[in-house]
Amino acid sequence: MEQVIHRDQTYCVPSRSLVDNIYLIRDVLEVSGSLGLQTGLISLDQEKAFDRVEHGFLWETMRRFGFGEGLIAKIQVLYSDIESVLKINGSLCAPFRVCRGVRQGCALLGMLYALSLEPLLQKLRLCVYGLVLPGFRNNMVLSAYADDVVVFIKDQQDVTVLTKITEKFSALSAARVNWGKSEALAVGEWSAPSSPSRSFLEERWF
């Protein structure tokens, strides 16, 4: 997993911890505040994250990451022929096939979810400018622990790119960002031309 999942995703990857995310966010806030850096943090709320994992998308993602067909087939067995029923007005409806979601209690749940989300995170790393600290060449774009994803932005352009990428990913994977529950924080000295529009998160800047 550590060879496939980028180091900024710490969920269910050996030698990584939620503590890494906490320290990173803390340091970004402290450094941005003390140096007056133009930094924005957007915490994405994934709507019913684990329940919206599309099985077909997950299998194809695993293939693209180089997992063998034998391993994929074994995992598919665990998720094949799953049915569910709904109870409506005291009566059970006819069973229907379940084609989404990673199973609660499954030992592979965390790893499968991290794999399903990694294509989105890869695209964000490539396209969002993020934060570059003085003295460092590499930019920091995000911090993720499972579906808890915080994206670092530099200006309105980053916000525009972020929204477009999440919309395209939703169309491909069935994942969905709930912008009404997402949060954002502006730190440092923002210049008027580059300040993100507050309307994109329904005035949820705080």
Residue ranges of model-derived segments:
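Nucleotidyl polymerases of mobile genetic elements and RNA viruses
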Residues: 1-206
